[in-house]
Amino acid sequence: QPLLAAGFVGSHLLVSDLFESRDDGFPVLSENDESTVTPGLFLCGPAVRHDNHIFCFIYKYRQRFAVVAKSIATSLGLPAEELEIYRKWGMYLDDLSCCGEECASC
């Protein structure tokens, strides 16, 4: 039996009280995908939104993993230079100016 069968609603709703909500119901995030009300809590996955940018497919939102990792490493005083290799692989999306507003346009 499944532990959680949430369908397409999104598991971010399970932690919604730890995030400020946007008008569209998605969490408000810092530029590093961190909660603006619960320091140290990061969101990864298809519920990540920045302005009108939607990271709905795994190949889009996984480009944000290194951004989160760098933020965590930096906050712990750990070196994060090795994460730059992800940029070379096209897996480090910190410049959202290249993204359109549609789901698959980053």
Language-model features: locations:
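Flavin (primarily FAD) cofactor-binding/catalytic cores of flavoenzymes
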Residues: 1-92, 96-106
